[in-house]
């Protein structure tokens, strides 16, 4: 996908939590949530469709998932890089991938 494409695509950010960063998670939680909800200053065509933590069997947060619509992966990467959880090392691994749903029962997401 090239920068500036007219047609938004879907992207998934999968961020694995660093168990040693529990204090930073707590300290940055409000700023992280504000970042996810803030629509000011995001690139045109960028919007979060769904987000939330993924729980480990032990009950702690193991990872977090964001499904976003954007015109290019660079916009998703820039949004992710500005996330307080990313800035303060709450995640130890982040993957951002283009996603093409082939089956969806989520309202508004259509499969190819």
Predicted regions and their residues:
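Conserved, structured core segments of small domains
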Residues: 1-112
């Amino acid at each position: 996908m090239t920068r500036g494409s007219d047609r938004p695509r879907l992207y998934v950010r999968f961020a694995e939590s660093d168990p040693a960063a529990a204090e930073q998670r707590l300290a940055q939680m409000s700023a992280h949530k504000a970042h996810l909800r803030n629509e000011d200053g995001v690139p045109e065509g960028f919007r979060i469709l769904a987000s939330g933590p993924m729980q480990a069997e032990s009950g702690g947060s193991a990872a977090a998932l964001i499904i976003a619509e954007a015109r290019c992966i660079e916009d998703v990467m820039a949004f992710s890089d500005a996330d307080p959880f990313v800035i303060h090392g709450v995640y130890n691994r982040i993957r951002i991938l283009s996603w093409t749903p082939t089956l969806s029962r989520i309202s508004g997401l259509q499969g190819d």
